[in-house]
Amino acid sequence: MAKERKKIIRTRIGEREITNEGIIYFSRGLIGFDDKRDFALIQLSENSPFLLLQSLEDPALGLLVADPYSFMDDYEVRLSEAEKRILRVENVRQLAVLVTVTIPPGRPDETTLNLGGPIVINSEAKRGMQVPQVDSKYPTHFRPANDDPS
């Protein structure tokens, strides 16, 4: 059995060890970061719904993300056939959906989730893509504590 190659990456929260299996490739980058393609998901703490989507090319670029289903049950993401091909989707069970999180400094009660621009990851193919939801009922600044997206 082949041994997994490990690599140390620098992040805003210190050094972390990842395996090559943990690298997710974004062929189009992310909105605003089109030139960054390789990322890793880093768990911040064991029971937290939040993760860090860390660029492997830029240690200063780490986006706080969360599973939107931790905050709402009926969130839906639409993917075009072209997006499914880019993500190499064979089965929807391969997909994980994340949304970016903004926590204003010193004001955690004003935390917002970007439901209008989810990040979809094929966990088997290690491919990711940010998929803007055009004509969506979901806002880009959803406050989970007191918003209703509809």
Swiss-Prot record:
Major subcellular location class: cytoplasm
GO CC list: cytoplasm
Highest taxon above the source species: Bacteria
Pfam families, per the entry: FliW
Subcellular localization: Cytoplasm
Annotated region described as Disordered, given as residue ranges: 129-150
InterPro entries in UniProt: Flagellar_assembly_factor_FliW, Flagellar_assmbl_FliW_dom_sf
Entry keywords, A to Z: Bacterial flagellum biogenesis, Chaperone, Cytoplasm, Translation regulation
Biological process per Gene Ontology, one example term: regulation of translation
Chain's role: Acts as an anti-CsrA protein, binds CsrA and prevents it from repressing translation of its target genes, one of which is flagellin. Binds to flagellin and participates in the assembly of the flagellum.
Sequence similarity: Belongs to the FliW family.
PANTHER family assigned: FLAGELLAR ASSEMBLY FACTOR FLIW
Subunit record text: Interacts with translational regulator CsrA and flagellin(s).
Name of the featured protein: Flagellar assembly factor FliW
Source species of the chain: Maridesulfovibrio salexigens (strain ATCC 14822 / DSM 2638 / NCIMB 8403 / VKM B-1763)
This protein's encoding gene: fliW
